[in-house]
């Protein structure tokens, strides 16, 4: 069964194929050379020294999935530019950005204006990169710089520390995994990442799990169950976390000196290992937590069946979830810009604000469920992105979402680069072009880059079956057009969709009822 699992992961691009390994290696090498030359030029101009001055003013440290060797065929590269004291964040965010605009090897360059981790995103030599920045106190970076030595954090501000901790966290996680369990760790991380994406519970900006939180969760389970094979480890993963006391017990690797300071940050805590620790699960809300817990329970039941009965139908575990199923009301966001290129370049600004919106909605007592539908829908012909938040509310109560919604809109509409409109839609009003097997072939701007504390900016192209009201009839019609062979499969589809809806909808009002009581003050 372990072999079949790995084969399934390979088929779903969770391993690099063909020449991708060499292409990524060359792109990293060229990017490192470019940044070192850029840093030296900035230093010479700022310090007024001779052009032949021997100084190492900047270099690159790769981290995340690539550094841990858990990257897939289409994975991007996370990298941190570590500089000397001469180079400033403005030199990086604005100066380097301006230079890269004129670099013929760079495409889809964009600034991601996250308050927690502003960074640059691009395609360089046909490889997706996300670059952030950390400034050290060194005049010249030593060749043998010890990235894990806490002295490196001296005189760093919060953004610098957070950026370099992306590298430090990766190295600590790598060291935490026993040597003989490295391959099991890589298989498990790929498995859980694919599972979360297929089941619609992946993405920091969508208030779900991100890359580093998955790596920490997996490393913790493996450290205590290193004797198990891959399938048993997967079963143990679901068993442990489906019964975890998330509200009281943080997940952390070993001891954590920052535990007392971090235990009140966020609904749950998945603490990064490098000091100062961050909560990798800070964006998760009480609503998205319930969704994650339901999916963990489902995963446990399926993998236990595989393990106990010798079944290896891995497609069942990774079957895409009907993302719109179970919600009566949606907030629809239509995002436009001056051009399609401008839209894909600046969509990160919209996504970076979703966490605060969802946290605001989670504080409204009348709302019993509110989650982002992960990823947006790109309407290339009309140059628009569509995003949705699914909601259910208590019966017979007025509902006012003005405060969080208007606050969100004021922020994302504050510049000239984006125009965001919001409206309330019943499930039956979701555009039919998004209703059946929608393929979101969206460029890299879809997601904001995931680290322990920054938001992601890479995209995934995924196919989900998304029902609208009347969802079952419409879905069956679509399936009939694709030649469903028999009545048994139709009935199975009905059963699956009703089950998914019933896991969410409890004591919720209908969409028509909600529309009568909904309040949004402009």
UniProtKB/Swiss-Prot annotation:
It catalyses: RNA(n) + ATP = RNA(n)-3'-adenine ribonucleotide + diphosphate. InterPro entries: NT_sf, NuclTrfase_I-like_C, PolA_pol_cen_dom, PolA_pol_NTPase. Residues 475-522 are annotated as: Disordered. Coiled coil: none annotated. Polymerase that creates the 3'-poly(A) tail of mRNA's. May acquire specificity through interaction with a cleavage and polyadenylation factor. Mg(2+) 2 binds at residues 76, 78, 130. Belongs to the poly(A) polymerase family. Binds 2 magnesium ions. Also active with manganese. It holds the Pfam family PAP_NTPase. Its EC number is 2.7.7.19. This is Poly(A) polymerase. One of its GO terms (molecular function) is RNA binding. It is found in: Cytoplasm; Nucleus. Residues 476-499 have a biased composition (Basic and acidic residues). It comes from Entamoeba histolytica (strain ATCC 30459 / HM-1:IMSS / ABRM).
């Amino acid at each position: 069964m372990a072999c079949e699992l790995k084969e399934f992961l390979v088929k779903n691009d969770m391993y690099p194929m063909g020449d991708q390994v060499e292409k990524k290696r060359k792109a990293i090498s060229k990017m490192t050379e470019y940044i070192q030359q850029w840093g030296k030029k900035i230093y010479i101009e700022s310090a007024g020294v001779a052009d032949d001055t021997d100084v190492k003013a900047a270099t690159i440290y790769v981290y995340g999935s690539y550094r841990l060797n858990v990257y897939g065929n289409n994975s991007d590269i996370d990298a941190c530019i570590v500089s000397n004291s001469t180079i400033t964040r403005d030199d990086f965010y604005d100066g380097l950005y301006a230079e890269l605009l004129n670099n013929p090897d760079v495409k889809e360059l964009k600034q991601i204006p996250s308050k927690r981790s502003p960074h640059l995103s691009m395609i360089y030599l046909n490889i997706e990169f996300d670059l952030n920045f950390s400034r050290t106190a060194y005049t010249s970076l030593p060749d043998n710089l010890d990235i894990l030595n806490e002295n490196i954090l001296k005189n760093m501000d919060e953004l610098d520390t957070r950026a370099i901790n992306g590298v430090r966290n990766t190295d600590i996680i790598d060291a935490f995994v026993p040597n003989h369990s490295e391959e099991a760790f890589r298989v498990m991380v790929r498995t859980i990442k694919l599972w979360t994406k297929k089941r619609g519970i992946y993405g920091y900006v969508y208030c779900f799990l991100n890359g580093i939180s998955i790596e920490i969760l997996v490393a913790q389970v493996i450290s205590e169950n290193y004797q198990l094979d891959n399938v048993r480890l997967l079963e143990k993963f679901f068993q442990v976390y489906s019964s975890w006391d998330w509200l009281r017990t943080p997940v952390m690797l070993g001891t954590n000196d920052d535990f007392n300071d971090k235990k009140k940050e966020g609904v749950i805590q998945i603490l990064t290992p490098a000091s100062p620790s961050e909560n990798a699960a800070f964006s998760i809300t009480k609503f998205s937590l319930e969704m994650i817990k339901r999916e963990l329970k489902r995963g446990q039941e399926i993998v236990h069946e595989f393990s106990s009965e010798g079944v290896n139908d891995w497609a069942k575990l990774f079957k895409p979830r009907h993302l719109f199923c179970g919600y009566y009301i949606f907030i629809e966001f239509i995002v436009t810009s001056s051009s399609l290129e401008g839209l894909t370049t600046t969509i990160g600004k919209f996504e970076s604000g979703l966490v605060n919106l969802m946290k605001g909605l989670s504080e409204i007592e009348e709302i019993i469920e509110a989650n982002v539908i992960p990823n947006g829908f790109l309407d290339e012909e009309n140059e628009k992105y569509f995003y949705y938040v699914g909601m259910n509310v208590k019966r017979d109560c007025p509902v006012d979402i003005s405060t969080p919604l208007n606050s969100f809109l004021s922020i994302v509409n504050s510049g000239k680069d984006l125009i965001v409109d919001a409206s309330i839609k019943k499930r039956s009003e979701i555009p039919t072009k998004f209703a059946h097997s929608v393929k979101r072939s969206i460029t890299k701007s879809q997601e904001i880059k995931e680290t322990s504390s920054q938001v992601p900016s890479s995209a995934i192209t995924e196919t989900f079956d998304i029902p609208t009201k009347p969802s079952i009839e419409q879905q069956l019609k679509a399936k009939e057009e694709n030649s469903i062979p028999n009545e048994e499969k139709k009935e199975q589809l009905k059963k699956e969709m009703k089950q998914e809806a019933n896991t969410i909808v409890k004591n919720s009002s209908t969409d028509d009822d909600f529309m009568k009581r909904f309040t949004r003050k402009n």
